[in-house]
Swiss-Prot record:
Pfam families: CinA, CinA_KH, MoCF_biosynth
CDD domains to which the protein is assigned, alphabetical: cinA
NCBIfam families (alphabetical): cinA_nterm, PncC_domain
Family: Belongs to the CinA family.
Signal sequence coordinates: none
Protein name as catalogued: CinA-like protein
InterPro entries in alphabetical order: CinA (IPR050101), CinA-like_C (IPR036653), CinA_C (IPR008136), CinA_KH (IPR041424), Competence-induced_CinA (IPR008135), MoaB/Mog-like_dom_sf (IPR036425), MoaB/Mog_dom (IPR001453)
SMART domains cross-referenced by the UniProt entry: MoCF_biosynth
HAMAP family: CinA_B (MF_00226_B)
Length: 413
């Protein structure tokens, strides 16, 4: 069953408001096994709305429309529907009575203006008139069109409680088994991910998508089939093939985060972690403590941004900083050892670098970063030369730090 999504609102087409309703609807429909034909965003112009509706209803099985159902002058969706399909607008008496009795008491808007909410195209089946939320279904040429408010929390509630159940019983819907997974990949460029997966020569029934989400690459795998056993077999074999092709560059799946995976690995091994940060300014600690229960494995950290803090809190020798510079492998190693001595953690990470935009030299340009780790199995320092903005360099530094620890914890130790 093909479905098209139309979002209406000048605030969307002008970029003033982010269109979150379409992405929510698409995700809900996709996970329920429907095909998304397309999504469009149009302004509050009746002629444009009408043309969009007529085009959509000709090419898909159902249409989902959000926005333009309110009581203000720029809410023109109902008017556009009536014009496009040649339908009179009629008052919904239940909504009308609610508007008069309730809304008039909680807003200064004229009752006559609020009554606009109750005037709907003939044949409109209101989802939840008692709630006062705009939203209805209209059948046109034996196809359902769902109209939802543009207010995100109202739209989401009606989508889940009314639209999805109605779609599930619609006679044109065939049940399709859907299996999907998102592979979260780090430290492998998108083109290399594509090259490796392309070599697998997966069948046309395997749908692959690549999505760069800085600083990661997300690969989506989708299998659909009317036979659930066939779909599951193909899904499992495709997952195995992708894992083999990408190896430990895959750090997690679906909604996993790097800090979550690192935390789980630390808990599994019964190990604790502490961090010493300079150029990342506490970003690693923030990522770790974003996870509930992180106190089980994360002891804490020191943000030693100024050189004096490196000496005072991490016991990094002043002479070492003067000789090698604050951004150096020697200082990174000393920071990792210093936080180890202060906290007694099983493993420690440290990072020092030049995030920019200033501070770089010919020998150490902006983006020079050193990440050190101290573990029961040895210490080491990794050198990086990152590109990008200050924020991107900081993010890359934090993510690579966690990835270094993840790879260490994956080993047979």
């Amino acid at each position: 069953m093909d479905i098209e999504i139309i979002a209406i609102g000048d605030e969307l087409t002008s970029g003033r408001i982010l269109n979150t309703t379409s992405s929510f609807a698409a995700k809900q429909l996709f996970e329920a096994g429907y095909e998304i034909y397309g999504m469009s965003t149009i302004g509050d112009t009746p002629e444009v709305i009408g043309e969009a509706l007529k085009r959509s209803i000709e090419r898909v099985d159902a249409v989902l429309v959000t926005g333009g159902l309110g009581s203000t002058d720029d809410d023109l969706t109902n008017e556009a529907v009536s014009r496009a399909f040649g339908l009179p607008t009629l008052p919904n008496l239940e909504i009308l009575s609610i508007v008069r009795a309730h809304f008039a008491q909680i807003t200064d808007a004229p009752v006559g203006q609020l009554e606009k909410l109750a005037w709907l195209p003939e044949g409109a089946e209101v989802f939840d008139p008692q709630s006062g939320m705009a939203g209805y279904q209209l059948i046109y040429e034996d196809k359902p069109i769902f109209f939802l408010p543009g207010v995100p929390h109202q739209m989401k509630a009606l989508m889940v409680e009314h639209v999805l159940p109605r779609l599930a019983t619609w006679h044109t819907h065939r049940h399709v088994s859907t299996f999907q997974r998102v592979f979260r990949i780090f430290n492998l460029p998108e083109n290399e991910v594509n090259t490796r997966v392309s070599r697998l020569k997966l069948t046309n029934d395997v749908h692959i998508g690549y999505y760069p989400v800085f600083p990661e690459v997300h690969l989506s795998l989708l299998i659909r089939d009317t036979n659930p056993k066939t779909a599951k077999r193909l899904f499992d074999s495709s997952c195995r093939a992708i894992k083999t092709a990408l190896g430990d560059h895959i750090y997690g799946y679906d909604r996993d985060t790097m800090s979550q995976i690192v935390g789980q690995a630390l808990v599994k091994r019964g190990m604790t972690l502490a961090v010493a940060e300079s150029c990342t300014g506490g970003l690693i600690a923030q990522k770790l403590t974003d996870m509930p229960g992180s106190s089980r494995y994360f002891l804490g950290g020191v943000t030693s941004y100024h050189n004096s803090m490196k000496t005072a809190f991490l016991d990094v020798p002043e002479r070492l900083i003067e000789k090698e510079g604050a951004v150096s492998p020697e200082v990174a190693e000393a920071m990792a050892y210093g936080i180890l001595e202060k906290t007694g953690a099983d493993v420690t990470l440290s990072v020092t670098g030049i995030a920019g935009p200033g501070g770089g030299t010919l020998e150490k340009p902006v983006g020079t970063v050193y990440i050190a780790a101290s573990t029961p199995h040895g210490d080491w320092v990794n050198a990086f030369q990152f590109k990008g903005s200050r924020e991107q360099i900081r993010e890359l530094s934090a993510q690579h730090s966690l990835d270094i620890l993840r790879r260490y914890l994956l080993q047979d130790i």
